[in-house]
Structure formats: C-alpha cells, structure tokens
C-alpha cells in the first residue's frame, strides 16, 4: 500500500522517539514526548510522517478534520523538524487507517496538512495546556459530572 501511495521511498525511521525541548514554554523545562510510527523519505527528498490508527470502517470528514486529532501529527512534524534540523516544507504528515472490518481497501492513507498557521495553533494549545498544568488550574468538564461518584457531594471540585 505504501508503494501505491508514495511511489519510490526508503524507510527513514520506525517508532521514532521524540523527546524534544518545548522552546515555546518558558515557565518550566518541559519536553515533548511522542512516538512516530513511521517516517519514510521519498525520491523527491520529502519526509512523510505516518501515524497508524486502528478503526472499524474508517473516519468521516468531521473526524478527519478534528483539531485535537490532527494536531498530534502537526506537533510530531514540528518536533521531528526540530530534532533533525529539517525544513518543515520538506515534511508531510499522514494518517494510515487500519480498518479491521473492511473486506477491501483495509488500509487507507490520507494526508493531513500542517502549515505554519496550524503549527502555531497546535503549539499555542500545547503551551496553554502546560500553563494550566503548571498553575494547577483544573478545567472542569461538566459533561462528565453525571457519571462521577462525587457528583453533588461536598468533594465535588
């Protein structure tokens, strides 16, 4: 399937570990930790970061464009480029859906764009989360209250 999608390529890394300093976060020393499933390099000199996702039938358009899902690849790209000193213009990101129940086309690869604006937005979300963690600001998700054992008790946060 990779040959069909990418043509001629070489495997650059498998299960690459990222432990990169988050330079955008100044309140504390923090590293971004991630594991990239596969990085290939195509004959045009581009790197392709691929993240495997298991599913039953595939993803609808809403899930394919969900920020919190696609930002994972955006941040992988940012920190991969930081680690290897690679120009982000030479890196593309993709999800590879491994469909358990599909009879045909049980692997689907699709590109996720990660330009400068999206990278900035993903980084901002990451930094804001780290600020809240550092300051011990716990955001309450009221949608989860009904199932909580502390719902409407004095221990309710």
Model-predicted segments: where are they?
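Short acidic-hydrophobic sequence patches enriched in Asp/Glu that either
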Residues: 68, 72, 118-121
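An active-site-proximal "capping" alpha-helix that borders the catalytic cofactor pocket
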Residues: 69-81
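Catalytic cores of nuclease domains that cleave nucleic-acid phosphodiester backbones
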Residues: 1-59, 85-92
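Short small-residue beta-strand/loop micro-motif enriched in glycine and branched aliphatics
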Residues: 57-61, 104-107
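Short alpha-helix boundary/capping segments
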Residues: 61-69
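Metal-dependent nuclease catalytic regions and adjoining charged, substrate-binding loops involved
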Residues: 78-157
């Amino acid at each position: 399937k990779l040959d069909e999608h990418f043509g001629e390529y070489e495997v650059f890394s498998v299960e690459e570990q990222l432990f990169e300093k988050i330079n955008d976060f100044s309140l504390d020393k923090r590293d971004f930790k991630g594991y990239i499933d596969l990085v290939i390099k195509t004959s045009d000199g581009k790197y392709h970061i691929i993240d495997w996702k298991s599913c039953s039938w595939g993803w609808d358009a809403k899930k394919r464009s969900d920020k919190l899902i696609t930002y994972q690849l955006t941040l992988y790209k940012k920190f991969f480029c930081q680690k290897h000193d690679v120009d982000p213009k030479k890196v593309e990101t993709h999800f590879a859906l491994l469909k358990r129940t599909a009879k045909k086309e049980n692997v689907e690869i699709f590109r996720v764009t990660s330009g400068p604006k999206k990278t900035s937005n993903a980084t901002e979300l990451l930094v804001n989360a780290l600020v809240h963690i550092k300051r011990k600001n716990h955001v309450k998700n009221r949608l989860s209250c009904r199932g909580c054992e502390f719902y409407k008790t004095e221990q309710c946060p």
